């Protein structure tokens, strides 16, 4: 066999390099280097071709910056960059030199270029640099050059003085060829040696030198496995190799989609699946995974339907119960996870998820890049315990909006479950979870979705989420998921598969997204909800969580955005009545109710009232934002505090469909503004903590006296007073809006805050249990300082009254009839004549009168049966939470002593089961136990500390 050396191709010019040892997929001609085999201590010139890869920076005028770091032996994954240079979105980053024609270069010595500000400068000598990692950007960071599959770009470094080899052409993004075609193979070695090329095991070319070229021919369809071998010769010489695979595509007869097949994984039995991908306008697709070394293989080429829109593959003989990672390779260059995956592996973010949060997480596989989907035929089914749950009447919903990250310090579903007793005692009968499907990163509100059917692993396992829902149902609490179907972010394969890199937006031919959003409030990529593909996606999402996780409904984020009516530049017009949007939501609601009767359709709509009336009267529940009105009132400015819009009757609706709230995740916390901006005079100072907390009692008394579904935001019942815009460093800035906020379970030990909790609890119980609070006959007079609500019902009449002013107010309260009425909170009675009574109310005082005597709630600051969920500590005793504790728990007590203290965990007979040592944080002695000691069975235990401190702890 004759070989020839392509000196012209392998001269002194910079060449593309294949990434070896970190990620087997090559970055191809996106990056080239001189020398061809760079080392960490020698000068290397790197050339970036902006027209290659994702091509996002092609034609973008300079300056172009490198965002770069290194992958070392200490990196935990291919995306674990070390010693990153520069700050994103600034000019404090390495500037590339323009060479023209979309080419940019930079030169440096890697060992000293990174970590340059250290003393001594450079990457520590003990740390091995395996590769250089890059993405490239414009100044603002709004346009980013990456690999074709959206992953980072890598350039390997090599050990000096050793033999290395690399296949330079074909590159990793050039793995598909046509039968009968030719391709010029180019390989190189770091020193003169014996080079040989094998194709499917047979040697087809040899040479002695540092490069080898050969014209490959592909006479027929099939796999062509290429191996480049470099043999230094001599005794003890080690042969080194580089490999790649090409697939010659033959003609493919159209195959109909198997009946009943939907996008994603279709489980046929415990060992057989059908994978289906909807990918119109694509030419071919392969399934990749460990079963084919993440390389295209003719055996795993997907069938295509006659309309060239669907690709599918049946896989048999799989191991039941085994998790199998997989991806799709589309058009030979787009490597994506299954957009309909129910579980993914993320090389950038999974490494930050503690094993206690997600035990036994499947490791990210070697041999590929980007997000990977996971299937599991024959997966064990979750054993549901509470199968007879009856959903509460929507008119009586007391919904608690909760963000897992900011509700429990562990950020885990399991510890939310530990706290359900707290919510049950509060009177909650519906838990609304902020988005729990996969979103970008691990630390987020969740409104940046990437995979709509996969549960985000940052909060726990899929079964942890199911157990939380199951436990809620066991306590009479419905569960609603916040789902984000207005948009998806860039990690979504639905966006990546049809992407306009030049304009950094969805392509015009995307079957899912609008290239340009239709309204000004859009974030991410705007779904086209009139597209059949998007409608199928929405249907799948709705069905998946209702059926697989048994949720009770959805809060649809930004539901007003489900429209193709273009209102860009005219936000006011966006809220106008939109008949197409109404029809879409009716279709969604009908579909949900057909799948799961009486499931909740909750819309964050905030459109004009005429449209909301139609949707509400159809049976949907619509968010009613009364934050401004209630906060004006609690701050002591009653003139601007009419909250009549919390009433469906005030809106002219026929059904009680307004889910009114004073606080939500998206609004400023009432107590923060009370303390910062509350009214002050000689009588009242709302900026005083106890005064502000006392005024907060007005909120549940009035909000929960209005018939219809209601919502409160987490810890509002305790007077949470950190701003929505609080930053981790304690400052307040709008850029920190979605950052993590302090988790303040210690509020429950403050008597004034616990009193507020009990007022909320009492009103919540009335709202969900007393028929009068769901009456259709009620009246609001809430415009002035003294506000009133009247409920008329055959079972009982109710009058709520309160002084929202900061001055003493005299007023006349109107009653539905004459006779004796009873103050619910005090037990006092009043006799009503002429349907009125005269009152003089101090600032912030509230009254709730009922025509039937009810047992007054126990609001005393001593023990209350509603507190049994937690072992309430006496002064100086230990605080233990959560309690009961399924798994981990935290113990603490106030202390000025900075020295570590010893604690013991004992059983009720006094036998010591474990010993712990505390830390001091400047205010408290504390210790966190991530798990119970081995062998500890469910029961009651005692935590014993110094100076006789103790607390009871329950393991359920």
Question: Which residue stretches match the model-derived regions?
Answer:
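Short, compositionally biased P/S/T/A/G/V-rich stretches that sit at domain boundaries
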Residues: 26-38, 156-177, 870-882
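Aromatic-rich carbohydrate-binding modules that target alpha-glucans
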Residues: 61-125, 141-149, 266-269, 274-323, ...
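C-terminal beta-strand-rich structural cap/linker in extracellular carbohydrate-active enzymes
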Residues: 285, 833-862
